[in-house]
């Protein structure tokens, strides 16, 4: 299956492209996607530990199954004071 990944600003700086198309096996989860991204672009691996995956405006967990054609946004948490 194919999923599209949109990297938020903090992640986009670490990657060659802010929008990616990734091929995964049927039944793959958000965690499987993170593993593939870390394998393809090792510089993303540390940031992926704290990233917030969002599908259709809703935060999802790493065990969330993905569907063919789905688009995810990966956002870094914001902190401040």
Language model: regions and residue ranges:
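Ubiquitin-like/PB1-type beta-grasp interaction modules and other compact soluble beta-rich domains
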Residues: 1-80
